[in-house]
Regions:
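Basic, gly/Ser/Thr/Pro-rich low-complexity segments located predominantly at protein N termini
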Residues: 23, 27, 33-34, 66, ...
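Unchanged
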Residues: 16, 31-130, 135, 148-156
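A broad "ordered helical/assembly scaffold" signature
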Residues: 1, 54, 67, 140-141
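N-terminal strand-loop-strand
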Residues: 1-26
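Buried hydrophobic packing segments
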Residues: 139-147
Length: 156
């Protein structure tokens, strides 16, 4: 927007017995049989997890698919714009916290290396620190692609 108040919405997943427990991610999940395509899945999952109005979401398009080895999933991210200021009512069963950095801040963020634990093993991964949270893995890759594409558009 003209006031540069556009935000990206990430979630901190709740703690549960699974490989993505307590991790930062974009809203999303598995394709249901009722989903006509992956675009529908992306919108449905976003609405379910964030509790926002589906009619105000405008999908811009897909980013590159990302494979996630620990869960053996191919993730198809989509970029969407919410037309208006969202009123969030996050699903407390899935979402512990909403993280909403300003787009203008995200565009200037630099990748760092962080230590994280995956299945009780310490690994060093490329990551971002966003509002005090370590963002790594598929989420960091999606953010990196988004930043690169957005900056290419702005600078062309």
């Amino acid at each position: 927007d003209k006031n540069q108040n556009t935000r990206i919405t990430l979630i901190l997943r709740n703690t549960y017995n699974g490989v993505h427990s307590n991790q930062i991610s974009f809203p999303g999940g598995k394709k249901d049989k009722s989903d006509s395509n992956l675009k529908h899945t992306a919108i449905r999952e976003t609405v379910e997890e964030l509790g926002i109005d589906e009619t105000l979401i405008n999908l811009v398009g897909p980013l590159s698919q990302v494979y996630i080895p620990p869960s053996n999933f191919n993730v198809q991210p989509f970029v969407g714009i919410y037309n208006g200021t969202p009123f969030f009512n996050p699903d407390s069963k899935e979402v512990s916290l909403l993280i909403k950095p300003l787009l203008k801040d995200l565009l200037n963020i630099k990748s760092i290396k962080s230590e994280v634990f995956v299945q009780n093993k310490k690994i060093i991964v490329p990551s971002y620190i966003i509002e005090g949270h370590v963002v790594w893995g598929a989420t960091a890759m999606i953010i990196n692609e988004f930043i690169t594409l957005f900056n290419d558009i702005i600078n062309s």
